[in-house]
Amino acid sequence: DCAHQNQQEKTFIDLIITKQIDGMLLLGSRLPFDASIEEQRNLPPMVMANEFAPELELPTVHIDNLTAAFDAVNYLYEQGHKRIGCIAGPEEMPLCHYRLQGYVQALRRCGIMVDPQYIARGDFTFEAGSKAMQQLLDLPQPPTAVFCHSDVMALGALSQAKRQGLKVPEDLSIIGFDNIDLTQFCDPPLTTIAQPRYEIGREAMLLLLDQMQGQHVGSGSRLMDCELIIRGSTRALP
């Protein structure tokens, strides 16, 4: 809430003023307090990991979310799917914007019209994935495959599809995003996009240490490779 956010901002500012922070590794797409680009120059060194916010002009380590999403949707098309739905994350999150763009660009490249009804949104929770899946299943022509912006929402979608009597992947293919540990053990195991979380964290920390030691580190992206991991939640249409 607003009071909690204000307290958080005050805490960070106090730490900076008292020089208790030598550097900051940001895991979100915004600063924990308001600061202009000019004001940022007086802050401790900062590196952004996993997210991408070009307006902050920070060194950033992340994957190419657009290409990763494109590859996932293109894979579904190659498996014969043409009614491909998308369970997207929050509209205000940059990575969700890029993942949705990847979905849209893949459909267009494959000659499929983008139908807004096939795009549902959630907040990265299991419950949101379940609700979004039901929204897609209620369509006159529901999708035969769904690309989800997160594994947690994909697991919610998988659960809801089963509750509606659908078999995955026989009746519906589902792809997630992140390759969290649980995806290997759900039934069926989830096809997903794996991010190199350790490597992203390591590279971001090395960039931060370079800055803290007085080296110049330019702003902009350092892209890490990701991988589409094929498991049991997707199959080719007969």
Where are these regions (language model features)?
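Short beta->alpha connector loops
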Residues: 3-6, 27-32, 152
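Bacterial carbohydrate/catabolite-sensing allosteric modules
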Residues: 11-18, 23, 33-35, 41-48, ...
